[in-house]
């Protein structure tokens, strides 16, 4: 039930390759559209990736293509978020904000796998994807709400 270690490592590698390859295109897009909107789209890609992946698991080429695309876009959450941080803070405040950003990102790397593992335990083999999709949906919804609040207060 599920993939072995070698296959799982290939999946992680595919997502990581996407994260590397998509840095420049996402940066280019971030220079041309509203960065908050791009951040919401990157977060929402987590929902789409989680929804599409079960349909391509039996077609390795399609699955790795989806994982490269998904990894590239979802990893843009960090990059675009960091760009927004740089827009908002300057000087010593930027250093403090960056430290807080890294700390919160690290907390997500601790809490996320716990939630994902619980999802996998609860609904094997789809629980991991359900958890990833739910986390991404919650983050995208939070970002959209925050963007709406900022636009209403302007």
What does each model-identified segment do?
Residues 130-154:
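Multi-pass alpha-helical transporter architecture, strongest
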């Amino acid at each position: 039930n599920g993939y072995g270690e070698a296959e799982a490592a290939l999946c992680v590698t595919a997502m990581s390759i996407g994260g590397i390859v998509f840095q420049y295109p996402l940066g280019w897009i971030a220079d041309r559209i509203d960065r908050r909107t791009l951040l919401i789209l990157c977060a929402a890609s987590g929902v789409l990736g989680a929804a599409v992946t079960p349909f391509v698991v039996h077609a390795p080429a399609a699955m790795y293509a989806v994982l490269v695309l998904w990894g590239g876009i979802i990893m843009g959450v960090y990059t675009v978020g960091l760009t927004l941080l740089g827009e908002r803070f300057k000087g010593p405040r930027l250093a403090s904000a960056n430290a807080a950003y890294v700390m919160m990102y690290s907390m997500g790397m601790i809490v996320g796998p716990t939630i994902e593992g619980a999802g996998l335990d609860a609904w094997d083999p789809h629980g991991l994807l359900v958890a990833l999709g739910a986390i991404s949906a919650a983050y995208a919804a939070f970002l959209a709400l925050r963007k709406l609040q900022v636009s209403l207060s302007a």
